[in-house]
Amino acid sequence: MGKYYCDYCDVFLVSESPSVRKAHNSGRNHLTNVRDYYSSLGHDKAQSYIDEITRMFETGGGNSTSNRGPGGNPPGSQPGPPNAGMSGPMRPPFSNSTAGPNMPPLPPAMLALMNGQNGMSSPGSGPPPMRFAGPPIPNNMPPGMMQPPHVNGYSSGPLPPQPQPASGGQGAPPLTARMNPDRARQLGLI
C-alpha cells in the first residue's frame, strides 16, 4: 500500500514519487473530485480557501489550521512534521551571504582568508574579486573559452599545414568550407 493518500479521491497511491502524484493530480477522476468538493462548499467558502492558499504561497507562510481540506490537511498536500514550514533549516552560527543558496556557509576563518585579512572579516563585506592566473585570452575568443588543442598536442603556435588535394583543386572542399563560419573563427582558421 502506498504512502500518499488523496483526500479528494479517497485512495492510496501506489508510490509517493512526485511523478506518480503529478500523474494522479492531473487525472480526470481526481480533477472531477476536486471540482465536486469545492462546488459543495459554496462559492464564498471556496474563494476564501483559495485566497488563503494564495496568501500563504506568496508570503511563504507555514501551516495554518484554518486552511484545511478534507481529512484535515491543506488540499493537495501531505501531512508533515510538527512546525513544518514555520521556519527554515537550522543555520550554523557563522552563516553568511558569500555561499550560494545550496552551498554550506563558509566558516569565519575561510572568510578572513578570502578577504585577504589576517583576522576577522568585517560584517557585510562581500567575497573578494576572483582572480585567476592563466594564459591571455586569444583574439576572437570569448572570455572563459580555452584555445583548442592542435593536432601536435600543443595549444600554442601555428596550426600544422593542411594537406592540399592532389589533383589540382579537385576532391573534398577545404575544412573551412565544411565548417560553420563561427566555429572556424573560434578555432582561428579564418
UniProtKB/Swiss-Prot annotation:
Q: What does this protein do?
A: Component of the spliceosomal U1 snRNP, which is essential for recognition of the pre-mRNA 5' splice-site and the subsequent assembly of the spliceosome. U1-C is directly involved in initial 5' splice-site recognition for both constitutive and regulated alternative splicing. The interaction with the 5' splice-site seems to precede base-pairing between the pre-mRNA and the U1 snRNA. Stimulates commitment or early (E) complex formation by stabilizing the base pairing of the 5' end of the U1 snRNA and the 5' splice-site region.
UniProt feature, compositional bias: Basic and acidic residues: 180-190
GO cellular component entries: commitment complex; U1 snRNP; U2-type prespliceosome
What subunit structure does UniProt give? U1 snRNP is composed of the 7 core Sm proteins B/B', D1, D2, D3, E, F and G that assemble in a heptameric protein ring on the Sm site of the small nuclear RNA to form the core snRNP, and at least 3 U1 snRNP-specific proteins U1-70K, U1-A and U1-C. U1-C interacts with U1 snRNA and the 5' splice-site region of the pre-mRNA.
Give the record's keywords alphabetically: Metal-binding, Nucleus, Ribonucleoprotein, RNA-binding, Zinc, Zinc-finger
Describe, by residue range, where the zinc fingers (Matrin-type) fall in the chain: 4-36
What is the recorded name of this protein? U1 small nuclear ribonucleoprotein C-1
Region annotated Disordered sits at: 57-190
One Gene Ontology term of the molecular function aspect: zinc ion binding
Listed Low complexity bias regions = 109-124
Tell me one GO biological process term. Answer: mRNA 5'-splice site recognition
UniProt-listed SUPFAM superfamilies: beta-beta-alpha zinc fingers
Localization, UniProt = Nucleus
Write out the biased-composition intervals (Pro residues). Answer: 72-82, 125-141
Q: Which family does it belong to?
A: Belongs to the U1 small nuclear ribonucleoprotein C family.
Give the source's domain of life in one word: Eukaryota
